[in-house]
Design a protein with these regions (language model features):
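Conserved catalytic or regulatory cores that recognize and/or transform ribose-phosphate-containing ligands
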Residues: 1-114
């Protein structure tokens, strides 16, 4: 690995990446993609949603149940969650993910102030 020309901050970060799971309404697909890139470039390992059902991805009711449960497992894997709450919007699914994360001792950060 070539780390000769990187800052001390980056050198200290290597191998110590925090894991963050993105939560929020899948209607905000562009925000998910932007935040994922921003957090990755800040040194986070980012776990995101697997499908954007509210942005046009076709998802059956059965798949929705599976994806909701799978997202809770993604929260389990993370150190924290990052809530994409564009214009202050937090839907029922996102609210349940926030409660789940808090009940499991995860730090919760919001894209916009609540």
């Amino acid at each position: 690995m070539l780390i000769k020309n990187v800052s001390a901050e980056v050198k200290n970060m290597i191998g110590k990446y925090e894991v963050v799971t993105l939560c929020g309404s899948t209607r905000f697909k562009d925000d998910f993609n932007r935040v994922q890139k921003e957090l990755t470039l800040k040194g986070y390992i980012v776990i995101s949603v697997g499908s954007f059902g509210h942005s046009g991805d076709a998802v059956t009711d059965e798949q929705k149940v599976m994806l909701d449960d799978m997202h809770k497992r993604k929260i389990d894997m993370a150190d924290s969650i990052f809530v994409i709450n564009k214009n202050g919007y937090i839907g029922k699914s996102t609210a349940s993910e926030i409660a789940y994360a808090e009940n499991h001792g995860k730090t919760v950060t919001y894209m916009e102030s609540c």
